[in-house]
Amino acid sequence: KEGYLVELGTGCKYECFKLGDNDYCLRECKAKYGKGAGGYCYAFGCWCTHLYEQAVVWPLKNKTCK
């Protein structure tokens, strides 16, 4: 599974500005989903890869980013 890293409190994606390989996104994806996860910046949001199937990613049901 893969998807955008989401802030559970707000429903917003984690923003990033350096597209492609991005240390911030990689670090945040690993912190949230475990050391096996990967991450990079895609369309100004942190995109996480190699996630477990139950991982929560953006968009959240019933919670829109404001």
Swiss-Prot record:
Expressed by the venom gland. InterPro entries: LCN-type_CS_alpha_beta_dom, Scorpion_toxin-like, Scorpion_toxin-like_sf, Scorpion_toxinL, Scorpion_toxinL/defensin. One of its GO terms (biological process) is defense response. Disulfide bonds join 12-65, 16-41, 25-46, 29-48. GO terms for cellular component: extracellular region. It is found in: Secreted. Has the structural arrangement of an alpha-helix connected to antiparallel beta-sheets by disulfide bonds (CS-alpha/beta). This is Beta-toxin Chui4. It comes from Centruroides huichol (Scorpion). The lineage of its organism: Eukaryota, Metazoa, Ecdysozoa, Arthropoda, Chelicerata.
